[in-house]
Amino acid sequence: MNNFIFGLELDLDSIKDLNLPVKFMEFIKVANAASPKKDILVINGKEYIVNNILDFNKCAEHENFFKYKTKLSEFLNPNQIPFSRDSFGNVFLLDIGTMIVSFYNHETGEISDLIDFDSFIKILNGNA
């Protein structure tokens, strides 16, 4: 069951050199540049809004993963990648080493660890 709308086909050549984990690759193939049907997530008692998944195609004009990665590079550790955003300019990050999802608050510059990637996807899909 696809829990996303308005997604774009992923050009696998765009991401072949990123060494992304298999679980994340499977997710991004389905959710590239899409908006989740369930956009309000409750994680550890706090609400987060997922507006859309970033577009991982190199040629993307809007919500381009590569532009976000460059823009946020000074704030991220080497294993963190941006993969989604909310409606307010904040960004969800994934540590591809630990598979922990974090939240970057653009107003404060703070990064908070939220939850492991599998649990994040379960909540996003309405299964938790």
State each model region's role.
Residues E107-A128:
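Compact, glycine/acidic-enriched structural inserts
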Residues K16-L18, Q80, S102, D116, ...:
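Functionally constrained cores in energy, signaling, and assembly domains
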Residues N44-Y48, F103, L114, I121:
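Solvent-exposed, non-transmembrane amphipathic alpha-helical segments
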